Amino acid sequence: MARVKRAVNAQKKRRTTLERASGYRGQRSRLYRKAKEQVTHSLGYAYRDRRARKGDFRRLWIQRINAAARANGITYNRFIQGLKAAEVEVDRRMLAELAVSDPAAFTTLVELAKGALPEDVNAPAA
């Protein structure tokens, strides 16, 4: 059986790893072993944070909606409850965008939500 030489493959693997680590500081961008460790961790962080980003944005949208709703005299919880009662299907991303870019339209939605809420706070939603 012929002997398998892996020098080319090994060099390519090392070059690729060092290229991926090109922006890092110190030994992490120059020494293969350090670069390999850092690139492995970096890829793991990227994978994790791509998923975390979705929750981060949802929390940001909720904060923006809550701030705008409170400026209009209603809490976030009651606002969302009122929108559901009024059968308005606008997602939080669009509500946050309206709150920032078009406060008049957001105020209209707040009035709509207030009108759809039951009078008694403790009464179950119909």
Swiss-Prot record:
One of its GO terms (cellular component) is ribosome. One of its GO terms (molecular function) is structural constituent of ribosome. It holds the Pfam family Ribosomal_L20. The keyword Nucleotide-binding does not apply. Binds directly to 23S ribosomal RNA and is necessary for the in vitro assembly process of the 50S ribosomal subunit. It is not involved in the protein synthesizing functions of that subunit. Gene3D superfamilies: 6.10.160.10, Ribosomal protein L20. Belongs to the bacterial ribosomal protein bL20 family. It comes from Beutenbergia cavernae (strain ATCC BAA-8 / DSM 12333 / CCUG 43141 / JCM 11478 / NBRC 16432 / NCIMB 13614 / HKI 0122). One of its GO terms (biological process) is translation. Residues 1-15 have a biased composition (Basic residues). This is Large ribosomal subunit protein bL20. Keywords: Ribonucleoprotein, Ribosomal protein, RNA-binding, rRNA-binding. Residues 1-20 are annotated as: Disordered.
